[in-house]
Amino acid sequence: AVGEEAKLMLGRTPGNIRAVRPLRDGVIADFDAAESMIKTFIQKCNEGRGILAPRIVIGIPSGVTSVERRAVREAGLAGAREVHLIDEPVAAAIGASLPVTDPIGTMIVDIGGGTTEVAVLSLGGTVLSESVRIAGDEINESIVAYLKKAHNMVVGERTAEEIKIKIGSAFPDNDFDMTSYEVRGLHLLSGLPRS
């Protein structure tokens, strides 16, 4: 399994299956797994489109080293004929339909899984950017730690991610009641399920 399908398996795999995260803090942590993941994504996107390997664009944190940049490019070349790298803040701004080519400053904050990117863009380029390796993964870890300390409750990474998305969204769900939120986990002392 790869991508969302594999993410759903985290913490739930039997002993003979190993779930790995090929990326950590926005960079490749397991090259072979990253290469395999990219190949699978390309195959899924390329189904029924012929045999010619595609050209791909990969977003990377703006603060990566040249070695990390080269590793991403090489992993991408495992399934593509051409790889273009784009700084994640630029990709996020384009995806958000911000005026990145206009002669004005546009600020973007992109909180990913492994890095948070803050950048000012203008005239199609990056004027100023900062990348910190603190992001969604650390928020998940903080939720797990808080529930353990404050409520003697153990929850998994997937539950922490669901909590983060539900109560920490930049675009709140108007139907969601923020005054209370039920969480299911295991009681730390008894080991029994609790809410």
Residue ranges of model-derived segments:
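Nucleotide/phosphate-binding catalytic cleft detector across ATP-hydrolyzing
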Residues: 1-111, 120-195
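Short acidic, Gly/Ser-rich segments with clustered Asp/Glu that frequently serve as metal-coordination loops
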Residues: 113-115
